[in-house]
Amino acid sequence: MNDFWQHCSALLERELTPQQYVTWIKPLAPVAFDASANTLSIAAPNRFKLDWVKSQFSGRISDLAREFWNTPIEVQFVLDPKAGMRSAAAGAAPAAPRAPLTPNGPAATVAAIAANLTANAAAAPSAPADVPMTPSAAAAHHLNADDADIDLPSLPAHEAAAGRRTWRPGPGAAPANGGEADSMYERSKLNPVLTFDNFVTGKANQLARAAAIQVADNPGISYNPLFLYGGVGLGKTHLIHAIGNQLLLDKAGARIRYIHAEQYVSDVVKAYQRKAFDDFKRYYHSLDLLLIDDIQFFSGKSRTQEEFFYAFEALVANKAQVIITSDTYPKEISGIDDRLISRFDSGLTVAIEPPELEMRVAILMRKAQSEGVNLSEDVAFFVAKHLRSNVRELEGALRKILAYSKFHGREISIELTKEALKDLLTVQNRQISVENIQKTVADFYNIKVADMYSKKRPANIARPRQIAMYLAKELTQKSLPEIGELFGGRDHTTVLHAVRKIADERSKDAQLNHELHVLEQTLKG
């Protein structure tokens, strides 16, 4: 029995992502094998994990058991809280070091860094949670366009006199005192809380994180510009602040500026009104690192786009790094000059997707820990299973649970969580269905909805069907067998193959990744 489980665990570890393996398979333990009845009992430490493993992995474990014993084996799952304790005693694997990425020039694509992610992915389970900017921090960065002065922090006198210097990251000394550190962050507008160390990593963002680390290590050289896009609350702002903070550690005197696109627009307007464009250009053209957040706000602002184009050209010519975020793919941003779009596409463009289940759990557990609350795994899994869209939604739900618990003087449990999130859960229950996914994908690829259920296998039908299966797994709570049934009674192994195939290709194929992003945004409304 133990020999089989070692064999089974080793195979599943190769087939699954590190985070999936650590979350679902590692806590399991074989407890009994009846050779006469051909039954194997496997224990899970809590009810949620038992139900999830039973629905998602029982078929694969049964297949491996049949191959191992050369006879059909009935796999039974039982509840045993000690199973988790036994697994925990084995210890966690040490985090892998950051793997460097090899720059491929200005035409680099997502595929260019995919092959370098092995070491970074291995570190994913131990990475702490994403901590997006709080509303108060965001307000400090996004000054009101009607009452803000032109926001051009002055450089230290000795730097201003020295003129433009070619800068490379090096082992810079830390600020000598707190006042100097405060001044450094005031000039850069960086949030010192947002670092690589407290950014949780999973399949949804590992490419973006790896690219960000590479840029932090080689600013102005590897991928310039770096363009990150994705929905609200997925960690784009966190990552670009992390890059800036890393550069400040490497070189305390670096000229860095984070600015939201709305503030940049406001500054352009005020510079125009006050005839202060020389100062404006002198400041932005002298930076070592420019971080522009939510550039879609440039849409329709022709004068702002013109000034940014000149700043972009000057910075890139001086080997300074430019990093941009948006809520959508560059070519999908309306009202932006074609010259700028072509510049955005000249570097590396990476999508950040909504976090997967294991990543959402890690974010909740870490956030609860930072609030001094011991959140049970069952509650974290319950919340993560029902709230799927972004990190801010998860954190908002957690705050609601904590407030509800404190107000009623009750311990946090699944029952209390259901009460606290009653309105949220009602909305979620009305969301995406497999049928809606099938119709949306069929329309997108110009095939019939009936082809989703048919046995036809030409590529122009089989491919969209696999994509629909992948989206059904990612965006609904249906199990693999349930999804297979809704796709013409297909076996769960067929669905699993489709999910793995599309997930793997997505990490390597920028066009497929873009198509999936469009479909996901369409389905989420």
From Swiss-Prot:
SUPFAM superfamilies attached to this UniProt entry: P-loop containing nucleoside triphosphate hydrolases, TrpR-like
Keyword Membrane tagged: no
Domain I, interacts with DnaA modulators as annotated region, ranges: 1-71
Region feature (Domain IV, binds dsDNA): 406-525
UniProt feature, compositional bias: Low complexity: 169-181
GO molecular function, one term: lipid binding
Gene Ontology CC annotations of this record: cytoplasm; plasma membrane
Top-level taxon of the source organism: Bacteria
GO biological-process terms attached to the record: DNA replication initiation; regulation of DNA replication
Matching InterPro entries: AAA+_ATPase (IPR003593), Chromosome_initiator_DnaA (IPR001957), Chromosome_initiator_DnaA-like (IPR020591), Chromosome_initiator_DnaA_CS (IPR018312), DnaA_C (IPR013159), DnaA_dom (IPR013317), DnaA_N_dom (IPR024633), DnaA_N_sf (IPR038454)
Region (Domain III, AAA+ region): 189-405
Name of one Pfam family that matches: Bac_DnaA_C
The entry's keywords: ATP-binding, Cytoplasm, DNA replication, DNA-binding, Lipid-binding, Nucleotide-binding
Residue ranges, annotated region (Disordered): 160-182
Binding site for ATP: G233, G235, K236, T237
Keyword Nucleotide-binding among UniProt keywords: yes
Location of this chain's protein in the cell: Cytoplasm
Function comment: Plays an essential role in the initiation and regulation of chromosomal replication. ATP-DnaA binds to the origin of replication (oriC) to initiate formation of the DNA replication initiation complex once per cell cycle. Binds the DnaA box (a 9 base pair repeat at the origin) and separates the double-stranded (ds)DNA. Forms a right-handed helical filament on oriC DNA; dsDNA binds to the exterior of the filament while single-stranded (ss)DNA is stabiized in the filament's interior.
NCBIfam families per record: DnaA
Assembly, per entry: Oligomerizes as a right-handed, spiral filament on DNA at oriC.
Family classification: Belongs to the DnaA family.
PANTHER family listed in its UniProt record: CHROMOSOMAL REPLICATION INITIATOR PROTEIN DNAA
Note on domains (UniProt): Domain I is involved in oligomerization and binding regulators, domain II is flexibile and of varying length in different bacteria, domain III forms the AAA+ region, while domain IV binds dsDNA.
Name of the protein in question: Chromosomal replication initiator protein DnaA
Species of provenance: Burkholderia orbicola (strain MC0-3)
